[in-house]
Amino acid sequence: MSAMRRCTCFIICLLTSYTYGTTELVEYTRGDIEFDSSNGEKIIDISTTKGIRCEWKVSSDYYTACFKWKFIWDQVDKYEVAGFSGQITVNYTTDSEGQKTRTVKVNLTDPGGEIWYNVSRSRYLSTYYASYNYTLEPQKRHMEAMELDKYFAPVDDRDAVLIVEGKKLHVSSCFLSFHSTYFHDLFEYDNSTSLLNIEIPVEGVSYEDLGLLLSVVHSTATFPNDGNSKKLLELASQFQTPYVLGLVENHLLTNTFAWNETLMLLADKYGLMRLLGKSIRRIDSIEKARQLKDSVFLELSDSAKVKVAYHMIQLL
C-alpha cells in the first residue's frame, strides 16, 4: 500500500467522542446484579453513554458495602462542557427492610471523579442484590456577564458613541480605529463633523456581544477564556480586529481544555497559523493519526488538508 493510501486510511478512522447539545441529558439504567460479600473491591458494571464511561465498583464484607461510581469523561469536549450534575438512584436489598432506594447527588468537575455511597447491615448477609440508574446534565461553559454600562460610560477620552440595540457604548474612536479596520472605516465615514456626542448605529451584532469584544480591546474587564473564545473569534473576524484574534490564539496555545481537533478547526477557520501548526504537530504518532476524525479532516480548508496529509506521511 502506498504512503498516501495508508495516510488516507488513517484520516478516515473515527475517534469515539461526544459534543453535547444545549439541553441534552445523559441517562443510563442497570438492572439487578448479584454479587457476594467477599472482601476486596471489584468492578461489577461498566457502561459508556454519550462519551461518559461509568465504572460501578463495590467494596464489601459481610456487614457493609460501599458502592462507587467512577465517571470517566475524557472523550467529552471540555472546551464546551465544564462538568456534569444530576443524580444516581440506587436500589439494594437489606436484611431487615427488604429493598431500599436511595438518591445520591452528583456534581462532576473532574474527568475521573468518583461518587461513593455506603450501605450498612445489622447482620451477616453473604449475597447482595443491587441496581442503579443515573441522569446527568452537562454544565456548559458560559461567558461571564459584564456590567457594560459601567465599563463603557462616558469619560473624557471617549469621543464616540456606538448605538447597539438602542443602548450606548462610549468608546475612543482613535483607539478603536487603531485596532479595527471596521471601526476605522466607520469613523472615517463620519468624520465630516466632530465625533463628539455623535451617535453611530452598529448593526448585525447584539449589545452584549459587541460589549464583549470591546472589553477585550480595551482590556477593561475581560480576557479570552474557554467560555468566550469561540465567540471572540467570530466577533474579531466580523469586526476585523486582529489584536483580539492574537489574544485568543495565545489563550488557545497555552491554557485551554479544548480537544486538538477543535483547535485545528478553529485555527484553520480564523487563520491562526501558530495554533494550526501546533495542532498538526500534536499528531505525533500513527495511533494519533488513526484517531483523527474523518469529519474534522473534511471540514478543513484545502491548504490545511495538505499540511495535515504531509505531516502524516512523515510519520510513516
Swiss-Prot record:
UniProt KW keywords: Glycoprotein, Secreted, Signal
InterPro entries assigned: BTB/POZ_dom (IPR000210), SKP1/BTB/POZ_sf (IPR011333)
SMART domains the record matches: BTB (SM00225)
Matching SUPFAM superfamilies: POZ domain (SSF54695)
Location of the protein in the cell: Secreted
GO CC terms, sorted: extracellular region
Gene3D superfamilies reported in the protein's UniProt record: Potassium Channel Kv1.1, Chain A
Domain BTB: 158-226
Main location, first listed in the record: secreted
Entries under CDD domains matching the protein: BTB_POZ_ZBTB_KLHL-like (cd18186)
Transmembrane segments: none
Residue positions the entry lists as glycosylated: 91, 107, 118, 133, 191, 260
One Pfam family here: BTB
Matching PROSITE patterns: BTB (PS50097)
Signal peptide limits: 1-21
Name of the molecule in the record: BTB/POZ domain-containing protein Y57A10B.3
Lineage, broadest ranks: Eukaryota, Metazoa, Ecdysozoa, Nematoda, Chromadorea
Gene designation: btb-14
